[in-house]
Amino acid sequence: MQVSNSMSLNDEEDDIEFINYIPLLASPINSSTCSTSIHDKCPFKQHISENGQNFGSAISSNISQRNFKTLRASHLSQYRDCNRENNTEDKNVISTGIAVNEKYQSVLKLKEKAPQISSAAKRKSFIKERGMLAKCFLARLEDEVFQGRLTSSLEKKEIGIVWSKSFSTTAGRANLKRNNKDAPLGKKTYAYIELSDKVIVTKERLYNTLAHEVCHLACWIIDNEMQNPHGACFKAWGKRIMNNMPYIEITSKHNYDIDFKYKWLCINEKCNKLYGRHSKSINPQKQVCRLCKSQIKQICPKIKQPNAFQIFLKENSKRLRKLHPHITHKELMKKLSDEYHRTKDAKQNVSKSVSLISSSDL
């Protein structure tokens, strides 16, 4: 199946069309899911160099083919998520002297003036719109790459999206279900993609993971290839998607930096193994580093040290409870508080008297 390229860049006016054509998609980091080595990237990433000449020759003559790759990256960078706080790369692209139109420069100025948004606000905004973003992206893949063949044999004529909280490190998983496993694909076939609520936290990860999982579904539904999950069939579909959408990158397995809520570090400087969990499931008092058997310490979130009053409560609550077994918890806390303040005042008076004696001796 050949993918037709609907872009036509023949003159200077089409340069503006090229900028407008780039959708509001973030540039990829590295994508995908499943069970292969992290560094096992697909060899078809050369699609940029293969098709660079077709794009470069169509753009205005004042932009050389050598600079096309940089121009493409600069255009895409302007449409990244607003959570990119550092736009020095975009400024460097402008300073290289590449010919860019006024519309592009206005986009850069608006980006520089945009207010800074907190990470919590970004996450909340992404959660609100991620369902619609995923649905629109899958519809575009079905229309431009698969030409309607992917969902035509499904009962609901669409691919479902399920957000999972149980995926702690896996970005996504494609699923194809039939009521009768021996029956061919038909009306009783359901397809859906599970996405990690903890890993998929940006648009770029969403689009790259969806593209990866859709390649699996295409192998199963269109080519009936069920054996090799990341074989020639998977790579062929991945190449077609990336040729049609250069801002998408499909690899065998993702290497996203997952933002774990809890982190522990091995105290052995030669090891320094970092452990991350979404819940407080590691107890440094009972568990050690699995590599060097050294102790580990919690580094995130930082453990707050107890203040003087908390230490006093821990040391004296049992004693006062034995002295007053029938009082309520509120009354017990009142007695502890009064005793703490008396002890604190006594210590301060002693320190003042000591300082006065020392000053008189001088």
From Swiss-Prot:
Gene3D superfamilies: High mobility group box domain (1.10.30.10). The keyword rRNA-binding does not apply. Keywords: Cytoplasm, Cytoskeleton, DNA-binding, Nucleus. One of its GO terms (biological process) is protein-DNA covalent cross-linking repair. Its main location: nucleus. GO terms for molecular function: DNA binding. The keyword Cell inner membrane does not apply. Residues 306-348 bind DNA. Coiled coil: none annotated. Residues 135-299 form the SprT-like domain. It is found in: Nucleus; Cytoplasm, Cytoskeleton, Spindle. SUPFAM superfamilies: HMG-box. GO terms for cellular component: cytoplasm; nucleus; spindle. InterPro entries: HMG_box_dom (IPR009071), HMG_box_dom_sf (IPR036910), SprT-like_domain (IPR006640). It holds the Pfam family HMG_box. PANTHER family: GERM CELL NUCLEAR ACIDIC PROTEIN, TRANSCRIPTIONAL REGULATOR. This is HMG box-containing protein C19G7.04.
